[in-house]
Amino acid sequence: MSIITDPIADMLTRIKNATKRKHKSVNIPFSNKKLKIVEIIKKEGYISGYEIVGQGIEKKILITLKYKGNTSAIFDLKRISKPGLRVYTTASNIPSVLSGYGIAIISTSKGILTDKEARKENVGGEVIAYIW
């Protein structure tokens, strides 16, 4: 068993690999931050659903992936802010992903928000990832 230094990057990689292999679902080790990110991905329509399974140290998030025909709803995911190089943005400089076709996930003082929600709330923060 290896030590995961960036759990968010690990989660995004697991989702990306599962979509490339056309899996129906993927298991992610549980954390509250990951759960909030998964809730945003679900709300934006990139996954079919999720559920929390197990208890204690075995607690996981089971993500049900979404496909249209043979194509995944998620084209790609990219980790932006990393443990060695944090990326922050102000409210006036929030990035737009693929001219609005994708989403940026931003950790703000008001919680984890999409780029659209952060603009509406007029808050900046750490840019966690892009999804399109």
From Swiss-Prot:
Q: A GO biological process this protein is involved in?
A: translation
The record's GO molecular-function terms, alphabetically, read: rRNA binding; structural constituent of ribosome
Origin, by domain of life? Bacteria
Q: Which UniProt keywords apply?
A: Ribonucleoprotein, Ribosomal protein, RNA-binding, rRNA-binding
* Assembly and oligomerization: Part of the 30S ribosomal subunit. Contacts proteins S5 and S12.
UniProt similarity note: Belongs to the universal ribosomal protein uS8 family.
Which protein, by its recorded name, is this? Small ribosomal subunit protein uS8
Q: Which organism is it from?
A: Mycoplasmopsis pulmonis (strain UAB CTIP) (Mycoplasma pulmonis)
Gene coding for it:
rpsH
